[in-house]
Amino acid sequence: MVATLERREEKRDWGTFATWITSTENRLYIGWFGCLMIPTLLTAASCYIIAFIAAPPVDIDGIREPVAGSLLYGNNIISGAVIPSSNAIGIHFYPIWEAASIEEWLYNGGPYQLIVFHFLIGVACWMGREWELSYRLGMRPWIFVAFSAPVAAASAVFLVYPIGQGSFSDGMPLGISGTFNFMIVFQAEHNILMRPFHMAGVAGVFGGSLFSAMHGSLVTSSLIRETSEVESVNYGYKFGQEEETYNIVAAHGYFGRLIFQYASFNNSRALHFFLAAWPVVGIWLTALGVSTMAFNLNGFNFNQSVVDSEGRVINTWADIINRADLGMEVMHERNAHNFPLDLASNEILPVAISAPSVVG
């Protein structure tokens, strides 16, 4: 009898907990995905703050030349970063218990893996939490779909690319200057500027910004005035009102005359779907591009592709980019190797037409 009562009480406690977790009446919705999201994101954020401030130098190239990234080791907000795991670790999973000591774990960049893995799990759970809340409120799942774009981009940069390159030392450092360093090295090694997927991503991000600005300015310019001239037009809107707050016919007519008729949407729902889909698809394609370049399926190579009738090379913009790539490649990991392979494989160029005569 006692055991039966205890089981009923446990079931009642679990039911109360489940109801609270999945309740849409809470100020912040938690959900089942939130049970995993909260501890992982808190862990990632805590470790990142501590590492950014006080982490010791990391032997990123695996050649016993540590690189300092924290504030206490001479960096500032711009130059500081959490340095990726050592090249000596490669793509091995490197938790604290795999190291002989905390000092060794820090020296080999263990915090980077801890932060990245917890962060990726956390943002994936955030995405799942968006779907869960939409489902419980009876909404369509497009918020979850839209957020999948930055999740895919983060996964491509922090997980897929290091795996494809064979080492987490090739991952993006967690800092401002580290991000730019990653971009420069990525261009040098993969020629991302000549990758169609990257071009689509640029069109998605900049096009999305343009369309957002156009839509916002059109709506703001065609608001239905409900206030006097001396009051802010924003006071004419009441939260939850059923009436349109702007004149879509006027906005459609203006934009149709500004460009041409069919460039303007006459359906508000189709318009907002387009505003969401354009940048999302662009970022999806960028993530796909980074994921394929992780396995060295690089951008197009048009180097020395234009020649005259006598076979002499006519340099194009592609050759200028190639020269810049070689320069960036030489500067990258300057102590890890003396001469990059892609530089050594090029045709030998003479530095002088003839040697000067030296009179003894």
From Swiss-Prot:
This is Photosystem II protein D1. Photosystem II (PSII) is a light-driven water:plastoquinone oxidoreductase that uses light energy to abstract electrons from H(2)O, generating O(2) and a proton gradient subsequently used for ATP formation. It consists of a core antenna complex that captures photons, and an electron transfer chain that converts photonic excitation into a charge separation. The D1/D2 (PsbA/PsbD) reaction center heterodimer binds P680, the primary electron donor of PSII as well as several subsequent electron acceptors. It catalyses: 2 a plastoquinone + 4 hnu + 2 H2O = 2 a plastoquinol + O2. Belongs to the reaction center PufL/M/PsbA/D family. It comes from the Eukaryota. The lineage of its organism: Eukaryota, Sar, Stramenopiles, Ochrophyta, PX clade. The D1/D2 heterodimer binds P680, chlorophylls that are the primary electron donor of PSII, and subsequent electron acceptors. It shares a non-heme iron and each subunit binds pheophytin, quinone, additional chlorophylls, carotenoids and lipids. D1 provides most of the ligands for the Mn4-Ca-O5 cluster of the oxygen-evolving complex (OEC). There is also a Cl(-1) ion associated with D1 and D2, which is required for oxygen evolution. The PSII complex binds additional chlorophylls, carotenoids and specific lipids. PSII is composed of 1 copy each of membrane proteins PsbA, PsbB, PsbC, PsbD, PsbE, PsbF, PsbH, PsbI, PsbJ, PsbK, PsbL, PsbM, PsbT, PsbX, PsbY, PsbZ, Psb30/Ycf12, at least 3 peripheral proteins of the oxygen-evolving complex and a large number of cofactors. It forms dimeric complexes. It is a multi-pass membrane protein. The record marks 190 as: Stabilizes free radical intermediate. Keywords: Calcium, Chlorophyll, Chloroplast, Chromophore, Electron transport, Herbicide resistance, Iron, Magnesium, Manganese, Membrane, Metal-binding, Oxidoreductase, Photosynthesis, Photosystem II, Plastid, Thylakoid, Transmembrane, Transmembrane helix, Transport. Fe cation binds at residues 215, 272. GO terms for cellular component: chloroplast thylakoid membrane; photosystem II. A quinone binds at residues 215, 264-265. [CaMn4O5] cluster binds at residues 170, 189, 332-333, 342, 344. Its EC number is 1.10.3.9. Chlorophyll a ChlzD1 binds at residue 118. NCBIfam families: psbA (TIGR01151). It holds the Pfam family Photo_RC. Tyr-161 forms a radical intermediate that is referred to as redox-active TyrZ, YZ or Y-Z. Pheophytin a binds at residue 126. 2 of the reaction center chlorophylls (ChlD1 and ChlD2) are entirely coordinated by water. Herbicides such as atrazine, BNT, diuron or ioxynil bind in the Q(B) binding site and block subsequent electron transfer. GO terms for biological process: photosynthetic electron transport in photosystem II; response to herbicide.
